[in-house]
């Protein structure tokens, strides 16, 4: 892939160009470590790092042009500077163009919401593949291009990485891209240049208030996906809404796309006629626009009833055959770290789940309670450098819904883990008789404590990290996997 620099400059008519425009651009990057010969280097000003400081390094590695907001005293030899008011906005224009707008060539399905995105997108991918399409997926756990899998670092990558990934999907012959679309990505315009065909809203509950500040701002960020759904030239855009979530009624009024709805009410396009939740599976009978769907699912939990309905809405919007949808749903056995049962030969049930929001924790605790014959344990913490308002809320939910609560660390990041736990404990002061609260900041120790103390018929929910295989502690990241800790404990009864 290459473009003439002059053609990129046509997108930035207000830019001041210092140097020759007669150059060929072979790559676009905002990471100085990724610069190659012929790169356009984008100098971004971040919260802690200013990309302008790496301009000289980028020049040494072969950058031939750079987007800047500030012109340095000494312009690197051979580098054309393109001075703009906002390099981030310029990046949003230039990058999709450089990669020939891959998000307009693929059929794009975006799933947004606080919870349920990963499960929903993974099921959609499998259904589309069963229907004969080549499919890419971008999500929290990984990025998939047909059968090629790479680890993901953000729910939605930055603009450059995202466009590069979509371009790779086009090169691999993909028909579809299924994406988890985060509120950060929408607010920061990471999805610039992408034209979605179908968008699904799972739910909106408290999360990311460290970034959005208010729930209204958070909802409005999610709403952008639907407000701009009909932008562009693709026909027949579809929006799928969970009408049991209050935000859906508001956002629905902001889209001009075709609308499909799901929820408990029989006035929805998709609604449950009956469902039975069992410890390891559930039966679900749904009414849909193409008739009843009778499902025997290998996943469980009322929250998954909603995920399944949202998936069906998207797939019916894409005209996928009902029988294909049902066959994939019946065979789907979940994704790592989403209400994942851990079997290590123990006499009780252990569940690992990514729940890290009040709503997510409430949902999985209620499902865990429904399958608990003994005591319900929960081991959880809250992430550092993130929304601290949810910490007491999660503590209160744990106390309400579990019998034995073990409060520990999640990813404390730069915060003191003990102070995070202190904030959770503001909701754990008045412990009812018969319930027990334990505080162990070492996550391995906390998990092992629950594993050692639980009795037959108990259920242990280890919440917060799910699929993650790391823990972020101040200035270092260590290997840590909740499931591995359980397996190791039961292999030699020690941690």
PLM feature segments, named:
Residues 18-28, 91-94, 157-160, 179-185, ...:
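Short gly/ser/thr-rich secondary-structure transition/capping motifs
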Residues 68-71, 181, 203, 409, ...:
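Short secondary-structure boundary segments
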Residues 40, 65, 198, 238, ...:
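Well-ordered beta-strand positions
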Residues 72-78, 198-349, 426-433, 437:
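Acidic, Mg2+-coordinating active-site environments of NTP-dependent enzymes
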Residues 1-93, 97, 268-276, 296, ...:
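N-terminal leader/targeting and accessory segments in enzymes
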Residues 64-70, 239-243, 379-380, 403-411:
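Short internal beta-strands
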Residues 89-243, 247-255, 309, 371-372, ...:
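Phosphate-binding loop of NTP-binding sites
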Residues 1-16, 37-40, 290, 310-337, ...:
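ATP-dependent carboxylate-amine ligase
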């Amino acid at each position: 892939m290459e473009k003439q620099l002059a053609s990129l400059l046509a997108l930035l008519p207000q830019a001041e160009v210092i140097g020759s425009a007669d150059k060929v651009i072979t790559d676009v990057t905002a990471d100085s470590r990724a610069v190659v010969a012929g790169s356009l280097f984008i100098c971004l000003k971040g919260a802690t790092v200013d990309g302008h400081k790496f301009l000289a390094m980028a020049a040494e590695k072969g950058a031939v042009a750079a987007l800047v907001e500030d012109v340095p005293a000494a312009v690197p030899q051979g580098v054309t500077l393109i001075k703009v008011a906002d390099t981030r906005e310029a990046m949003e224009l230039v990058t999709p163009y450089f990669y020939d707008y891959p998000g307009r060539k693929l059929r794009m399905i975006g799933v947004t919401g606080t919870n349920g995105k990963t499960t929903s997108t993974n099921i959609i991918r499998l259904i589309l593949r069963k229907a004969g399409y080549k499919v890419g997926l971008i999500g929290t756990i990984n990025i998939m291009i047909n059968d090629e899998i790479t680890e993901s670092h953000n729910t939605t990558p930055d603009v450059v990485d995202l466009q590069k990934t979509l371009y790779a999907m086009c090169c691999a012959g993909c028909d579809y891209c299924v994406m988890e679309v985060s509120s950060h990505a929408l607010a920061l315009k990471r999805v610039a240049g992408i034209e979605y065909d179908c968008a699904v809203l799972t739910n909106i509950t408290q999360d990311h208030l460290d970034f959005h500040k208010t729930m209204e701002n958070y909802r409005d960020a999610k709403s952008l996906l639907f407000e701009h759904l009909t932008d562009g030239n693709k026909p027949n855009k579809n929006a799928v809404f969970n009408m049991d979530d209050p935000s859906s009624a508001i956002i629905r009024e902001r889209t001009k796309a075709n609308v499909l709805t799901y929820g408990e009410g029989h006035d929805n396009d998709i609604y449950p006629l009956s469902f039975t939740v069992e410890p390891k599976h559930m039966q679900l009978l749904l009414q849909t626009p193409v008739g009843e769907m009778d499902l025997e699912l290998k996943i469980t939990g009322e929250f998954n009833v909603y995920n399944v309905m949202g998936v069906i809405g998207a797939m019916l919007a894409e005209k996928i055959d009902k029988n294909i949808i049902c066959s994939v749903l019946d065979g789907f056995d979940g994704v790592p770290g989403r209400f994942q049962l851990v079997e290590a030969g123990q006499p009780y049930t252990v569940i690992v789940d990514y729940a890290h929001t009040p709503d997510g924790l409430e949902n999985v605790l209620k499902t865990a309670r429904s399958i608990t014959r003994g005591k319900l344990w929960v081991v959880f913490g809250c992430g550092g450098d993130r929304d601290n308002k949810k910490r007491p809320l999660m503590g209160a939910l744990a106390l309400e819904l579990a019998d034995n609560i073990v409060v520990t660390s999640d990813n404390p990041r730069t915060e003191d883990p003990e102070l995070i736990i202190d904030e959770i404990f503001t909701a754990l002061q008045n412990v009812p008789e018969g319930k027990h609260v334990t505080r162990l900041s070492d996550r391995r120790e906390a998990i092992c404590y629950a594993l050692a103390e639980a009795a037959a018929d108990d259920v242990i929910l280890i919440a917060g990290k799910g699929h993650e295989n790391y823990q972020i502690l101040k200035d270092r990241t260590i290997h840590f996997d909740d499931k591995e800790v359980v397996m190791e404990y039961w292999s030699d009864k020690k941690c």
